[in-house]
Swiss-Prot record:
It catalyses: a secondary alcohol + NADP(+) = a ketone + NADPH + H(+); prostaglandin E1 + NADP(+) = 15-oxoprostaglandin E1 + NADPH + H(+); prostaglandin F2alpha + NADP(+) = prostaglandin E2 + NADPH + H(+); prostaglandin D2 + NADP(+) = 15-oxoprostaglandin D2 + NADPH + H(+). Monomer. The modification N6-1-carboxyethyl lysine is found at K239. The active site is at Y194. This is Carbonyl reductase [NADPH] 1.
Amino acid sequence: MSSNTRVALVTGANKGIGFAIVRDLCRQFAGDVVLTARDVARGQAAVKQLQAEGLSPRFHQLDIIDLQSIRALCDFLRKEYGGLDVLVNNAAIAFQLDNPTPFHIQAELTMKTNFMGTRNVCTELLPLIKPQGRVVNVSSTEGVRALNECSPELQQKFKSETITEEELVGLMNKFVEDTKNGVHRKEGWSDSTYGVTKIGVSVLSRIYARKLREQRAGDKILLNACCPGWVRTDMGGPKAPKSPEVGAETPVYLALLPSDAEGPHGQFVTDKKVVEWGVPPESYPWVNA
């Protein structure tokens, strides 16, 4: 494979929104599209399904909580393509409301995948992103809701323009510890484990965008967080109003921003629109339009 061939990669892509993103990228992206999944059999089955539609994704195994798995993917991308043009971090988990797993265990497992896993992928793959590359971190307005349920002190920290990656990791670890000690409400946290992890993903995106601006200004890489909306998936449930295909629209829009685009960068985007970080979803100007 020539290093001149462009390549896009989607994590957690064997079903749901990730699968729909891969399908759209296969149709619209000028280059190879790599579908990744933790489970090889499910990932390969997803590739076969898309091949039956006349599309040609590639498959590579990826478990975002396994550093060895991430590094094997890095080696593949370096060898086959000399880097990466588009990264969509979609892999995530959520516990259903009626799940009997103890709250602190839910917090630990959700944080391990949604925040720490996404961070590990970014740590390893961002250095491979080529000039004019695009990075999309799939977050959620559930993170915005959770932010608005946090104490003013925590909100101030998460909205800070100067928060560091180390400070953010410390806060995410503190949330998990506070749930173990039964004091997370007393310490000012939301009750939504999923929401808190998505606060982390959104703030991490702002931090990485800032670093790219400072360290690789001439490369015109654009990195954003987005919310696909409430989507009918295993995670979103059958009552959600959006199909996975509609949910894929905003991530794909950000993944395919034209090469001469100056933005958005470091923003939170939903319905293809930039919204101010931390503003409650009910206040988005088009919600009641």
